[in-house]
């Protein structure tokens, strides 16, 4: 594979997926029903052993879906972790585990990358609450950092560094056949050293066979691409690239790019048409055949000059990359690898070093607030910038669980 322009290094090759659940010995005879209680007892013992490794500390966040606690290892009080206790809901009572939890555990066990949050262990409690032992990321999230315009300033070099870390995580997911489907600033947590970590894999899924339909009612609405508003049921990594483009624009402008209010599909499509252009057969062949297609008003696709006026601070190459990440036609939109190969990364200014990045993204409590949310929610704080009220419940989350859709 040719070298990537991103920091003059090749895109990171797919790491081997971790196999964290041991397979039963091949010689085990499961036909004898008398072994079942022994296996169950062993599982309970192992679960108890794992649970007893940690001492829970203060609660960092609490929501309808989960509570998040700071904790440390009994064997080493300096080793901090975050324990996400997922609350028992209707699907837990029916299936034994929530859909989102199953997705998150599955993919975090498989994906091991410096820019993806680490899952250290999983254990349950007697009341069936599932506990995920996650990497402790004490600097909060990118959303709080973006919103703190009073005390935090950052540069194009900082934006380049954050986006590069995000793109490496997304490239790694896609190279391993995983779509994240909920990329947004409050799912980008900040480690003590300034590294960005992609979190919340509750809406993730494996890339499907081209003929297998997938749900279109996914991805937090402000970061959802037009093909999903048009009810496309066959899609790939382009949906994540659009979300990354939205994050890129938000970092530059310090405001949400597609902030429709009231937040519904029709208003979102109108806003995308206003800011990017109306999808038509000329710029997106086949779009009118999508069953959810609507064109409130035909608005020409914005020129590069229009984009430069709005995002001049990131430079011409940065604007070029942004335009290609937010291409209306998902077949024209850059792939995650294509994003990493763009010359933006090696142009001046070069990405900031970790030690020079702003790190005050709200602290450990913000990590808790981010981790407690269910996938697809907008910030539960309030106004359109996420600083007050709680409109996350209005975001549609009809997840079709058939075939892990």
Describe each PLM feature range:
Residues 128-141:
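Conserved short submotifs of the Hanks-type protein kinase catalytic core
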Residues 56-64, 68:
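Protein kinase glycine-rich loop
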Residues 67-90:
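Glycine-rich ATP phosphate-binding loop
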Residues 350-405:
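C-terminal intrinsically disordered, low-complexity extensions immediately downstream
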Residues 162-163:
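Activation segment signature within eukaryotic-like protein kinase domains
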Residues 278-323:
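C-terminal lobe substrate-recognition/regulatory segment of protein kinase catalytic domains
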Residues 118-130:
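Short beta-strand micro-motifs within the conserved protein kinase catalytic domain, predominantly
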């Amino acid at each position: 594979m040719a070298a990537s322009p991103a920091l003059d290094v090749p895109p990171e090759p797919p790491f081997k997926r971790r196999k964290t659940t041991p397979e039963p010995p091949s010689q085990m005879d499961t036909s004898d029903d008398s072994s079942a209680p022994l296996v169950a007892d062993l599982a309970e013992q192992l679960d108890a052993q794992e649970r007893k490794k940690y001492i829970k500390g203060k609660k960092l966040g609490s929501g309808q879906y989960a509570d998040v606690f700071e904790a440390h290892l009994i064997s080493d009080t300096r080793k901090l972790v975050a324990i996400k206790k997922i609350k028992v809901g209707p699907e837990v009572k029916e299936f034994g585990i929530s859909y989102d939890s199953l997705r998150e555990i599955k993919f975090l066990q498989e994906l091991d990358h410096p820019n993806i949050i680490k899952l250290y262990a999983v254990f349950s409690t007697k009341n069936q609450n599932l506990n995920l032992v996650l990497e402790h990321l004490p600097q909060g999230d990118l959303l709080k950092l973006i919103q703190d315009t009073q005390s935090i300033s950052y540069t194009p070099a900082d934006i380049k560094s954050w986006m590069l870390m995000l793109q490496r995580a997304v490239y790694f997911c896609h190279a391993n056949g995983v779509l994240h489907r909920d990329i947004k600033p409050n799912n980008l947590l900040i480690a003590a050293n300034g590294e960005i970590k992609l979190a919340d894999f509750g809406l993730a899924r494996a890339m499907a066979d081209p003929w297998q339909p997938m749900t279109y009612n996914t991805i937090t609405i402000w970061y959802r691409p037009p093909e999903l508003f048009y009810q496309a049921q066959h899609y790939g990594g382009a949906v994540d690239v659009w979300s990354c483009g939205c994050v890129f624009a938000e970092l530059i402008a310090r405001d949400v790019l597609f902030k429709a209010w009231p937040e519904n599909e029709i208003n979102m499509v109108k806003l995308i048409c206003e800011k990017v252009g109306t999808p038509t057969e000329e710029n997106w062949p086949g779009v009118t055949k999508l069953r959810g297609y609507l064109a409130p008003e035909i608005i020409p696709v914005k020129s590069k000059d229009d984009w430069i006026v709005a995002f001049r601070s990131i430079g011409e190459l940065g604007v070029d990359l942004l335009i290609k990440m937010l291409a209306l036609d998902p077949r024209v939109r850059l792939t995650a690898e294509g994003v990493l190969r763009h010359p933006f990364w090696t142009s001046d200014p070069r990405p900031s070093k970790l030690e020079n990045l702003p790190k005050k993204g709200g602290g450990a409590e913000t990590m808790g607030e981010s981790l407690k949310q269910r996938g697809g929610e907008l910030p539960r704080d309030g106004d359109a910038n996420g600083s007050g009220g709680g409109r996350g419940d209005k975001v549609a989350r009809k997840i079709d669980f058939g075939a892990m859709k």
